[in-house]
Amino acid sequence: MKSTLLNMTAVLFGITLIASAGVGAVNMITAEPIAQAEQAAKTAALNGVLPAFDETAAETLTIDEMPITVYTATKGGQLAGYAVESMTKNGFGGAINMMVGFTPDGEVINVNVLKQAETPGLGTKMADADNVLLRSVKGQKLEEKKLVNGKLAVAKDGGDVDALTAATISSRAYVEAINRAWMAYKSVATGATPTDVSSGATSAAGDTAEEQTSGPEAQEGGQNE
């Protein structure tokens, strides 16, 4: 009986050891391709919001308790622009991540939405090329926009950023992430002290109640301008 128990223990130990070795080997094999894919995705995102560059230096700031990374891009030793990897947790479907490009003097070059889980056909349009949100900021210096308490805001909240049709919550979240990127850009480019960006993405009480009584496809549809 004792011998059988020892044999079973030895077998189980051997199986566990082999399984652990197998998992470790798989991790070693897949780690490099995953890292390469992540780097390729980041390079593509930077290329999408910056002019030609050959080097970047990254600096991560904390704004609203979130990590916001600023990439200072140079070409031939000359400043080419800044790319800011920004985010918000206040999208209708959760977190939204984006890359925002700025010229050295603060003009928005482009915005590339990297991750979002908004309502298909409504909030997801923020990732479309030439959508109304992007048109409201691209090629412009944000300090020259109609600001509310020093920040960008959608028209419904007193600003001049056009919101996506029937997707006010998503639009507010997009603008919040842009504001956070702008704050980070100013901190790195001009030395301004970064301050938290008060959320404009949380819906008003009436908006929330309207969403809760709507069907899945109509949830953001209840937020018509």
What are these regions (language model features)?
Residues 2-225:
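Flexible, solvent-exposed loop/hinge segments and secondary-structure transition points
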